[in-house]
């Protein structure tokens, strides 16, 4: 075994040992750690390696301005040395080390600001793994150790040893053992039931899980017994007596056992995100992705970038090939991005790092600005994190847009994560426009290919102001809908929205590129072709109706009257008119809340549209519109204000239908009388156009 594993067993007669009491809060914390059962004990190694990494960061920083600081040891590394015989695990670093004052203050007599906060968090049910966020990670050593010895050497002081069995006190003495040069050695004397942390496999597993991206080499020292072959020449010494062979014995090579120390670097996967993206191959990204996620498939897309300026961070984001089966489960952690601060892993479930709709993104974010001991509460308030989040979302959307340029790959992406895009449209108002460009739908004209809203807009008819859609359960179901059939007759394309989340999506997505999204199954459907006719009819009817709209409900009738949500029904209007003490002002207001719905598929309405478009000043249109309106009133259960005028219009239509000329002197007196009472028909010189209505 290397010299570092030798614990200090030298005589201590001449060494002065000082004993100190732990500060009250630290003693409480240690008692809590020792006497409470925690299943997640393995985090002790992460914390000690993280501390070593911090110490190495400090000496490296000092050496930038004063290279002589590294004269006491140029190599910056961390060694892990398990010793099964002594039941010790030693963590050695060549970091900045501690002076005697540092030892006394940092490891026992001065409580960190986070000590009390962490104890409160623990008692409230927080996980022990959060210990490092409160700056007291060192004490996690007592999760597995009954005694801890810390030997340290700082450039400005002698070599000292700190030791405690957590009995409320610790000792500090000058260390006369093997000179370290510079750095710190933490020797854990493990509890009898914690020897699993001496196993090579277990140590490798923990380092891979928690510390594989530490910026300094972590080397594991393992003693291996090897069978060493001994040649015949070596085996026989010059003085050996001649060997007498046993009769019948096989010729066998002599073997002897030899104990060797294997050194294996555990974190060869260097922080790939710190390298220049141009120097990294797809294979390297693939290996890193698999080591990060344990996914058996390669990633679908990757985005590697860094942000510099007032804020500095690097990020590496991956899109997996398939969505996890529990993507939208409530109990699932909110994201899969690991947060590092200066190469030290902080957490992998920081909800503030990325919005929920992007929770399928895997990767790492490494910030230079966040403090290492940041807590969840601090993260929630952190302005730095808000800026990081905004940048991550922006880069994710860029990545999806780039992916959309490759139809095949985007199809795979959309099959897996379309729900996330739609959830984003519902939740993320700031990026709604960009997200809407990523949507893909089947339409009544696209066949088996999904198209974007932009594609739909390029195929829109001239003067079409709306994007028409229908929601339903399956493509076949909505394709066979009567609503879709009507629009297809008019040459209009309808988008098929067949996922439940589409309903929530379109609640927020009101328009795309200035075109309003309109459901073909809801009231208020406007066909551009009939917009002009509806406007003309409203102008003619003035206050008689609140609005004129294209109907979704009519099949055989040319038009009908419906009341608005707040207007009176036909029956209610009849009842109110019969009231002796009625309020006439209310009558006029409530009675006016009628909607005239026209059937775009009816020949009367189509011919009327053509008539109005052929000559906007055709006065016969006015009579036809009023006649249609009054007839619709009757068929919808309402009464007429002036039945006689309506009757006169009907008689006039009958005359036209029979081909009777108004100027014919042989016309009967009754007809003449009717004609006198009736207002002159506007535009009656063109009887042929009136006949087109039939």
UniProtKB/Swiss-Prot annotation:
Regulation: In the resting state, through the dimerization of its C-terminal domain, HSP90 forms a homodimer which is defined as the open conformation. Upon ATP-binding, the N-terminal domain undergoes significant conformational changes and comes in contact to form an active closed conformation. After HSP90 finishes its chaperoning tasks of assisting the proper folding, stabilization and activation of client proteins under the active state, ATP molecule is hydrolyzed to ADP which then dissociates from HSP90 and directs the protein back to the resting state.
Residues where S-nitrosocysteine is found: 560
Cellular localization per UniProt: Nucleus; Cytoplasm; Melanosome; Cell membrane
Binding site for ATP: 51, 93, 112, 138, 376
GO process annotations (BP): activation of innate immune response; cellular response to virus; positive regulation of defense response to virus by host; positive regulation of interferon-beta production; regulation of apoptotic process; response to antibiotic; response to cold; response to heat
Region (Essential for interaction with SGTA and TTC1): 691-694
Extent of Low complexity compositional bias: 668-677
Record-listed Phosphoserine modification sites: 231, 249, 429, 452, 603
Chain segments carrying region Interaction with FNIP2 and TSC1: 261-582
Region (Essential for interaction with SMYD3, TSC1 and STIP1/HOP): 690-694
Motif TPR repeat-binding: chain residues: 685-694
SUPFAM superfamilies with a match to the protein in the record: ATPase domain of HSP90 chaperone/DNA topoisomerase II/histidine kinase, HSP90 C-terminal domain, Ribosomal protein S5 domain 2-like
Region (Interaction with NR1D1): 590-693
Region (Interaction with FLCN and FNIP1), start-end ranges: 261-694
Skewed-composition ranges (Basic and acidic residues): 228-241, 256-268
Region (Disordered): 228-275, 662-694
Compositional bias annotation for Acidic residues: 242-255
Post-translational modification: ISGylated. S-nitrosylated; negatively regulates the ATPase activity and the activation of eNOS by HSP90AA1.
Enzyme class: hydrolase
CDD domains xref list: HATPase_Hsp90-like
Record's keyword terms, sorted: Acetylation, ATP-binding, Cell membrane, Chaperone, Cytoplasm, Hydrolase, Membrane, Mitochondrion, Nucleotide-binding, Nucleus, Phosphoprotein, S-nitrosylation, Stress response, Ubl conjugation
HAMAP family recorded: HSP90 (MF_00505)
Function noted in UniProt: Molecular chaperone that promotes the maturation, structural maintenance and proper regulation of specific target proteins involved for instance in cell cycle control and signal transduction. Undergoes a functional cycle that is linked to its ATPase activity which is essential for its chaperone activity. This cycle probably induces conformational changes in the client proteins, thereby causing their activation. Interacts dynamically with various co-chaperones that modulate its substrate recognition, ATPase cycle and chaperone function.
Family of the protein in this entry: Belongs to the heat shock protein 90 family.
This protein's name: Heat shock protein HSP 90-alpha
Species this chain originates from: Oryctolagus cuniculus (Rabbit)
Lineage of the organism: Eukaryota, Metazoa, Chordata, Craniata, Vertebrata
């Amino acid at each position: 075994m290397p010299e570092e594993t030798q614990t200090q067993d030298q005589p201590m007669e001449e060494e002065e040992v000082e004993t100190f009491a732990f500060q009250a809060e630290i003693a409480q914390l240690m008692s809590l750690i020792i006497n409470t059962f925690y299943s997640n004990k393995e985090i002790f190694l992460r914390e000690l390696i993280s501390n070593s990494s911090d110490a190495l960061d400090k000496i490296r920083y000092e050496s930038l301005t004063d290279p002589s600081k590294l004269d006491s040891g140029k190599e910056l590394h961390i060694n892990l040395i398990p010793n099964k015989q002594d039941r010790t695990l030693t963590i050695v670093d060549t970091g900045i080390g501690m002076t005697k004052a540092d030892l006394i203050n940092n490891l026992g007599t001065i409580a960190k600001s986070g000590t009390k906060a962490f104890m409160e968090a623990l008692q409230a049910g927080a996980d022990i793994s959060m210990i490092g966020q409160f700056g007291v990670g060192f004490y996690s050593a007592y999760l597995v150790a009954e005694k801890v010895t810390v030997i340290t050497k700082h450039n400005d002081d002698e070599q000292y040893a700190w030791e405690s069995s957590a009995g409320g006190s610790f000792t500090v003495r000058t260390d006369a053992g093997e000179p370290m040069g510079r750095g710190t050695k933490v020797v854990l004397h493990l509890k009898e039931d914690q020897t699993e942390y001496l196993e090579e496999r277990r140590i490798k597993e923990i380092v891979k899980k928690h510390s594989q991206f530490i910026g300094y080499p972590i080397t594991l020292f393992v003693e291996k017994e090897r069978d060493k072959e001994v040649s015949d020449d070596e085996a026989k010494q010059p003085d050996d007596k001649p060997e007498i062979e046993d009769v019948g014995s096989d010729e066998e090579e002599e073997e002897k056992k030899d104990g060797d120390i294997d050194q294996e670097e555990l974190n060869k996967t260097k922080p790939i995100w710190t390298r220049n993206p141009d120097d990294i191959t797809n294979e390297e990204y693939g290996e890193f992705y698999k080591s990060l996620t344990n996914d058996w498939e390669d990633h679908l897309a990757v985005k590697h970038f860094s942000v510099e300026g007032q804020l500095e961070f690097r990020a590496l984001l991956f899109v997996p090939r398939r969505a996890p089966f529990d993507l939208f489960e409530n109990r699932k952690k909110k994201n899969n991005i690991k947060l590092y601060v200066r190469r030290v892993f902080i957490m992998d479930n920081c909800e503030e790092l990325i919005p929920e709709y992007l929770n399928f993104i895997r990767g790492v974010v490494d910030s230079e600005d966040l403090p290492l001991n940041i807590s969840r509460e601090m993260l929630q308030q952190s302005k730095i994190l808000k800026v990081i989040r905004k940048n991550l979302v922006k880069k994710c959307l860029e990545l999806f847009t780039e992916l959309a340029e490759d139809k095949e790959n985007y199809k795979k992406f959309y099959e897996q994560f379309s729900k996330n895009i739609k959830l984003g449209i519902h939740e993320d108002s700031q990026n709604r426009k960009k997200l809407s460009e990523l949507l893909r739908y089947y339409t009544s004209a696209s066949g088996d290919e999904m198209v974007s809203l932009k594609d739909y807009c390029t195929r829109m008819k001239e003067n079409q102001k709306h994007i028409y859609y229908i929601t339903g359960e399956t493509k076949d179901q909505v394709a066979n809908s009567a609503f879709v059939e009507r629009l297809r007759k008019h040459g209009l394309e309808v988008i098929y929205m067949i996922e439940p989340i589409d309903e929530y999506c379109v609640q927020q997505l009101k328009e795309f590129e200035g075109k309003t999204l309109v459901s073909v199954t809801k009231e208020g459907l406007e066909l551009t072709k009939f917009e002009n006719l509806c406007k003309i009819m409203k102008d003619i009817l003035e206050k008689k109706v609140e609005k004129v709209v294209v109907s979704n409900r009519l099949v055989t009738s040319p038009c009908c009257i419906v009341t608005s949500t707040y207007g009176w029904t036909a029956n209610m209007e009849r009842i109110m008119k019969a009231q002796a003490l009625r309020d006439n002002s209310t009558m006029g207001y409530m009675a006016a809340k009628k909607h005239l719905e026209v059937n775009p598929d009816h020949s009367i309405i189509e011919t009327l549209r053509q008539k109005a478009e052929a000559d906007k000043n055709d006065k016969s249109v006015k009579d036809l519109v009023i006649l249609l309106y009054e007839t619709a009133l009757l068929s919808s259960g309402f009464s007429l204000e002036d039945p006689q005028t309506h009757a006169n219009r009907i008689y006039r239509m009958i005359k036209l239908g029979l081909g009777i000329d108004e100027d014919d002197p042989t016309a009967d007196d009754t007809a003449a009388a009717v004609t006198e009472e009736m207002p002159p028909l506007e535009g009656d010189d063109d009887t042929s156009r009136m006949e087109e209505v039939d």
